């Protein structure tokens, strides 16, 4: 573990990993808006099929987090991340084959679904592998900083990938876009080849659900945090349009500014003062942002709510993730982090359809009341996490 004694070198190496993850995660982000457009306009299928093609990748990610964590524990973070990037590239190739001119719409859609399922597996394996590898390089005491960097790479890819994906779809067509998504992970694979591996830790393995039993409180907190982000991403523009307010497109911008600003300024805080205190304050800020969105009298108050939501959401994942790392031995770290991330994945996947049903009956503002209540419940879970930690220390 010589790398952990040279923090500047270890940090630079994890920044290089973050850059590779950003480059590779563009494969996910660029496809996100392009896939439903291709399914509906290119294949002539219904909107429901377009939504399924997007959502199936996230379902695959949720279902494979445990397996990805077990790979990271058994094989080491570097090999796990490398496998994830290869799977990314293979998924891009399969989605490229879905654009083959000789295929019927049904056959093309079937091939596309297979590629999207594989993409979800790749996302799961690559992210868990990188977190495990990064913590191995920087040390247990800086696990929160590692997870903050991972989030910056992923959300940065989302911010750039959406418009870039639509631009490439317009200029290159769906096949050309999928070729790019297959090439980017290979570039990331080359970029991380020179970085040193960290040997996996020896120790007795435990069943996945037993590990979940150890970490469910921080997992629930991060999942409840994700409700507000998912609600904002899905319904902010519709909320503004229903009220006749201007600047409907600035909601995610304000969220992103708050999110990135807090990651840059406070990414070190979970390691310095503890994950639970950071999560408690963060979830309180997110709840305030969601309640402000719910009660907003005008567009600028709502935009301020989006900014507060971004500030609040930013550090919950690394803060609660650092608590997870404390609660399991090193040889189970990857499995625990995989299960932990699945809580957030589940929140992202379930919030859209559930909140949509509620919005149909109660209006779009009601969605943000639900987000505020979820963040408040998450705040309570973070408080109980701190109490459990204090009892264990006593």
Language-model features: where?
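C-terminal ends and interior cores of transmembrane alpha-helices
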Residues: 86-105, 285-297
């Amino acid at each position: 573990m010589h790398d952990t004694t040279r923090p500047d070198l270890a940090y630079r190496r994890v920044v290089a990993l973050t850059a590779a993850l950003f480059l590779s995660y563009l494969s996910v982000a660029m496809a996100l808006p392009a896939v439903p457009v291709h399914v509906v306009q290119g294949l002539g299928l219904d909107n429901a099929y377009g939504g399924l093609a997007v959502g199936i990748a996230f379902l695959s990610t949720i279902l494979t987090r445990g397996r990805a964590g077990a790979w990271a524990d058994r094989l080491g973070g570097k090999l796990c991340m490398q496998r994830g990037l290869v799977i990314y590239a293979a998924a891009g190739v399969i989605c490229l084959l879905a654009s083959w001119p000789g295929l019927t719409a049904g056959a093309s859609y079937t091939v596309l679904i297979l590629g999207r399922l594989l993409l979800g597996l790749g996302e799961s394996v690559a992210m868990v592998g990188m977190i495990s590898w990064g913590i191995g390089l920087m040390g247990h005491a800086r696990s929160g900083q590692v997870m903050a960097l991972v989030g910056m790479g992923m959300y940065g890819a989302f911010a750039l990938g959406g418009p870039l994906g639509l631009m490439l779809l317009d200029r290159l067509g769906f096949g050309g876009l999928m070729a790019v998504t297959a090439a980017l992970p290979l570039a990331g694979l080359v970029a991380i080849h020179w970085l040193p591996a960290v040997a996996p830790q020896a120790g007795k393995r435990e069943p996945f659900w037993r590990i979940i039993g150890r970490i469910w409180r921080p997992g629930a907190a991060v999942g409840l945090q994700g409700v507000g982000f998912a609600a904002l991403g899905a319904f902010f523009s519709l909320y503004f349009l229903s009220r006749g307010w201007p600047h409907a497109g600035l909601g995610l911008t304000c969220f992103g500014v708050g999110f990135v600003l807090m990651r840059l300024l406070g990414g070190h805080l979970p390691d310095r003062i503890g994950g639970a205190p950071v999560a408690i304050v963060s979830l309180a800020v997110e709840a305030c942002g969601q309640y402000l969105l719910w009660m907003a009298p005008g567009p600028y108050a709502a935009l301020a709510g989006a900014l507060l939501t971004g500030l609040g959401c930013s550090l919950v994942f690394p803060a609660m993730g650092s608590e997870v790392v404390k609660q399991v031995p090193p040889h189970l770290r990857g499995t625990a982090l995989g299960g932990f991330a699945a809580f957030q994945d589940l929140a992202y996947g379930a919030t859209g359809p559930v909140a949509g049903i509620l919005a149909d009956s109660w209006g779009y503002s009601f969605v943000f009341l639900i987000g505020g209540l979820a963040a408040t419940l998450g705040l309570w879970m973070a408080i109980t996490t701190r109490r459990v930690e204090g009892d264990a220390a006593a």
